[in-house]
Every structure is written in C-alpha cells, then in structure tokens.
C-alpha cells in the first residue's frame, strides 16, 4: 500500500484505479472484526492521491463505484463498511435514487429544525443510523447530523454549506473508534470551518475494541 497504491502517481506517474473494500464497523465482534484502521489510510492522504469513503446508502455506494469507472482519471478507492449495512432496515434507496443523481460527498440532516439546532454531529459510516435512531426516539430536532460520506479528498466546501444553516451551534466529530484511532486526527488536520470542532469518542486504547459484546 505504501509503496504503490498511495504513491504510484507521485512516484512513477502511473494511474491506479484499485478498489479496496474493507470491513469496518463496531458491532461487538472483537478487535479483529471491528476496525480496518482508517486512520492509517487517512495518514497517507495528500495531493488528492486516494479516495477514502464510508458511505451510508446503497445509492451512494452505486454512484461511488460508477464514478470510479466514469472519471477521466484513475485514483485508488478505499471503502470502509460493515456487513450489518447489508441488512439494516434503514439502509435503503429508491430506484430513482439509483437511476438519477451522482455521488454525494456529504449528506445533510432532514429531521432537525435549523432554527432550533444547538449541536451538529459530524459522523461517517454506520454510526449515523445509531445516532439517527436516538435522535428520532428522543425527538431531538435541536441536534443535526451530517454524514461525511467521503473523507478524502476532504469536502470542506460541502460541510461549510451544511453548517451555514446552524451558525450558533456547537460542532462535534462523533466516532465509534477510540480517541487515538478513526478519523479524529485527520479531522483535526483537515477541518477549516468557522465553528470550532470538538470530539466524542471512546477513550484511547491499545486495542481497536473489546472482545466482550456486553462491554461493547
């Protein structure tokens, strides 16, 4: 990965359209089945060398793969996604979503009331559905959830467009991974928004996750 996938264009002026589908998501299955080490791929990102995505809808997955072939250039695509998304009842798309549109680097909140929002949660991947269920169960229309479907190249312009609706809100990066893993250090480096960014994460850990589902 270091020798060729992330640096082939910089080193040898060679395009590389490889797609890596990496199982990633905290589902209580232990450290070997929970974490694909996204922080290590994000550390390699520079000069638009990689696409790193963690999508939340079938339509966006389709458009992501379609973009990979339709683009007039080639870049490696790193995809983080858990198996549970295949059967999640909320992870569905209409035929119209599949037939029309294009890949969305970010997806905004359609439930929260912009006039009431006090907190904005930035997240990626399946964690969105857990946050969504809690948001709707507690009727929290004062909390907005923004999905970062593509981490690199970093979609700062799209994020700014979403945050413009919530100018007085506090902004948090929320992740399932421990503080020293996941996308937090990458967000610290890349996020340039007007709203200061805070983090909600598990405590730092030497292991990606616990092996006990009850503790998880």
What are these regions, as identified by a protein language model?
Residues 18-20, 42-46, 82-83, 135-141:
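Generic detector of short, locally flexible boundary/turn motifs and exposed helical patches
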Residues 24-71:
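Conserved thiamine diphosphate
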